[in-house]
């Protein structure tokens, strides 16, 4: 399971050399609030001049390598600034950033990962607000009150189905339709999607929603698989005819390659924000601010071309075509124990 608080505590517990960490902190880059919050007509010029001197930046991300390569290459071409990328799962991104900071090591400039992990970094005071002019272009839900990380794109949980095994006209219209015996042995779900579960149950009503999913699992069974990429591939292969929680962009990417897969939404579709944030002690602050701006501007069109859902209002996306409910990462972080336990008890442990 994704235990955000536990992951953070584990990373902090590993720091045993307190004296060495304190000495390292004294040599750390300065707080970059002034650069991050720079405004004015000459802002862009000052950022570019500073970034040219810094020459590079370091970027931690949990997004797929191929997708992020498109963005970093475009940034490098535009500014001539080298982007050093380290990619891992969202939990490992969080652990590495927190561990390095506690050790007084500040290598990373920008982090891009799931909303709950970004919220932990905010609460640990590792991020800084960037007063980007491109914030005005984003949907309101992309901007949290503290503004220390911004949702640059969304992971939208959708249903995925194998088009050779299931006809579009036969798809379920609601979660209640999943009680139909025709779905027996055909359903699949990802093993750690308790945040999706909390959003769906919130829409259905807690008592009604929990009973419904208990009944669905008891009646028709459900196959639990770890990893959205694996689950999506199993839908395409036909091993899982219908999955409840695939990311729409993953299904779209396979569909565009000719795989027999498509996606649909149970209204409202549940959306998890993915965020971008600048580190308060980024070693390359001017380059970091430029990259932050880039993620909210030029990168939005590039993300769309990679079948992601960007948050800019200037980009036409499925946001305009379906009702969407946004998961609040602050709520998920605070209520993780409750929803993780319910998801395990009702879905994972009862899976067939």
Regions found by a protein language model. Give the residues of each.
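Immediate post-signal peptide segment of exported/extracytoplasmic ligand-binding proteins
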Residues: 26-58, 76-77, 179-184
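A bilobed periplasmic-binding-protein/Venus flytrap-type ligand-binding module shared by bacterial periplasmic
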Residues: 158-165, 201-203, 272-287, 303
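Extracytoplasmic ligand-binding site segments that recognize negatively charged/polar headgroups
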Residues: 58-72, 84-101, 106-239
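Periplasmic-binding protein-like
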Residues: 24, 137-141, 154-155, 183-192, 213-218, 222-225, 294-315, ...
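Extracellular/periplasmic juxtamembrane helices and adjacent flexible linkers that interface
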Residues: 298-352
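Bacterial N-terminal signal peptides
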Residues: 10-21
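A ligand-binding cleft/hinge motif common to bilobed small-molecule-binding domains
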Residues: 117-120, 241-260
